[in-house]
């Protein structure tokens, strides 16, 4: 049975321009992410999934698909519920 999970993604964006970062933030919001105002680069999204791992995978997939159009290095920490925290580092080329 599917449940709704709140997935937290904290990021570090290396080598991205200010305009590209603003555009990316707007696109993330269009895809259901909500910016967490207390941290400079943290996002939350609600995902319907069978478990916490699936919810984190969905959130990562959406986040990466939005980001991959910009050339920069993305470092992220992803967490949902009580399961293990996922750490990822990805580089995107122009």
PLM region spans:
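Short structural boundary motif marking the start of a folded domain
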Residues: 3-7
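Short, surface-exposed ligand-recognition loops at beta-strand->loop->(often short) alpha-helix junctions
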Residues: 11-19
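A mid-sequence interfacial segment
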Residues: 84-94
